[in-house]
Amino acid sequence: MEEKSDIAKKKGIVNEKDGSAMVHIPAGTFLMGNEKNSVNVEAFYIDKYPITNNQYKKFIDETNYAEPAFWKNVKFNNPEQPVVGVNWTDAVAYANWAGKRLPEEKEWEKASRGTDGREYPWGNVKPDQSLAVFDLEISKGAPTNVGTHLSGVSPFGCYDMSGNIWEWCQEWYTEGKYRVVRGGSWINHLNILSCSYRSCSVPAGKDNNVGFRCVKDSA
């Protein structure tokens, strides 16, 4: 795939366990949230794409872990679609198996937004269907294969961080009740797709618009 950002070419790894391409996010500050506060983040690697059904199948095959919801639904089980129907615990189990972890919110947002406080991964232009997957009918729509929207790439070279699927993060949104999800999804309105938008889901939820990507500490 053609990379839009020169930054993305500087450093990257392939995670041996699950074969995921990961991009390097350098240490330093970025502008976080609607208030654009300066927040420091240590260096880390993050999956270039959300975890796919194909990758999750390898995890299931090696561990006998339970299949996700929607696993046999043809709308959601293409090997290169992002895995959905996984709850927070499922995502953590996969991350542990792969030698990775779920991202902290600040890590996720920096990977999505870059350092300049932009509204969306690609800049400040409002989303359209060439940039992201959103606002589809529940009865007819579904997530696209990962990496389909090349123009929606983030400054660091991450794909699908706006729309397509929500992504689980480490933190509680409300302690003991909801976990943070980020990014918006294929069924959401464009107003929800900004890099700073925060939402949540019950940790046990297995929805057809929630998946995840992982991070790994930088050596």
Predicted regions and their residues:
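Short, structured beta-strand segments at or near domain termini in extracellular proteins/domains
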Residues: 208-219
